Amino acid sequence: MKHALENFKIIDLTRVLGGPYATQILADHGADVIKVEAHIGDEVRGWGPPFSNGMASYFINVNRNKRSIAIDLLSDKGKEILIKLLEDADVLIENFKTGTMEKWGLGYEEVLKEKFPKLIHCRISGFGQEGPLGGAPGYDAIVQAMTGM
């Protein structure tokens, strides 16, 4: 059976919930999603219980149907590996704090736009990139506290 996104390659630099859930849906629809984890692994692996084979079921669920690779994006070699992965990618999805990609020398305007003009760069954030809360972390507990839930 053909899937709607089977010819799309997505590089997934996301963590926690919003980003991994978004890329999980893309993978479920056939996209080739490559999850790039920190060189020490994804901290969400240990968020449980329940656990299965030493991994949190939460982590297993939001990362199903994905391939993964661990890369140290702070190192020159790690940046080279990411650039290589992006050469034939359609989409890059990340949910780092505002300015992180730029600090690493991987910003869209500074590097990615020119090097990969067809690449779609999706930046997920809780409060957007600008405005009074722009760039602030947007975890569920924070949103609940702010809204009085």
Located regions from the model:
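N-terminal helix-loop segment corresponding to the beta1-alpha1 unit
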Residues: 1-149
